[in-house]
């Protein structure tokens, strides 16, 4: 739930961003009424942008992480983050989260820690010597 009692949902949608899969969000009030239209999260539209996760922040905004399968991290798929305010307006550009870029990084999750920092986890092919380390 968001600080105002509402909530936000995210999904991947085919061709809604003009290409393949893109990530979108929508805000709802505490009664379940939509209070925003579809908000595009990803600005990179090549390849697939999907598998999103959302975390509500204390200031009423939210963070979205997702997998970008566009090669924008230099090799394969990478993990990207974007922050939004309480009205679903973006307050950051896309931020690459993963520093290890060989192969595929995918299946990201995000949570807010007690101190307000974000913790992002994901699986990474071969980074720890196995195919799917976290």
Question: What is the meaning of each model-derived region?
Answer:
Residues 1-134:
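Extracellular, repeat-based ectodomains that mediate carbohydrate processing or recognition
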């Amino acid at each position: 739930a968001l600080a105002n009692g509402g909530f936000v949902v995210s999904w991947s949608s085919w061709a809604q961003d003009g290409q393949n899969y893109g990530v979108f969000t929508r805000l709802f009030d505490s009664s379940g009424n939509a209070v925003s239209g579809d908000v595009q999260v990803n600005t990179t539209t090549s390849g697939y942008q999907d598998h999103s996760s959302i975390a509500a922040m204390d200031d009423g905004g939210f963070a979205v992480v997702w997998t970008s399968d566009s090669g924008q991290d230099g090799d394969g798929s990478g993990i990207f983050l974007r922050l939004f305010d309480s009205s679903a307006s973006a307050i950051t550009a896309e931020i690459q989260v993963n520093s290890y870029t060989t192969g595929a990084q995918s299946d990201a999750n995000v949570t807010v820690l007690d101190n307000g920092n974000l913790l992002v986890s994901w699986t990474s092919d071969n980074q720890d010597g196995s195919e799917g380390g976290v």
